[in-house]
């Protein structure tokens, strides 16, 4: 949410698995900008919130089956026969889960609108996300380049708009000024922005930012 770093998950997964570990990937900041491929990543767990991809406020978790079967029951003692039972201690929210299907409709409509073709739905949606990425890189590049060249502003994260390296989330700071004062100045200039830690509290603290 701050640095916008796209981590080399597959390389990290290979190293983790080499010593018998499991890797959990938090994709909440990536999923809106890139189509996750858990098989290619070879991760054991992948999580994100579907509201980040224009869906309902529901958490989504993929878990490798072999790891899933090692988990302890989180629900009623008599609901321990299936993952669906032991991972829903209070029972599923049927309406919210059902509304996740709207995500497929949303992407299908965008695919049709842009005339994207492909053999499978995933192929078509992958092409759609590639179009998203190209557009995002195009519109963020001028701002990223301006911040890199600025004599006072400091871009947080990789100094590039390359979508393979960073997501199109842009954070910066100006040494000697508070983020609140920068926010106020930009809002006064009718530039939409925000300030704060954006749930990256430890990162902001480690970077020494306010």
Where are these regions (language model features)?
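Pyridoxal 5′-phosphate
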Residues: 1-210
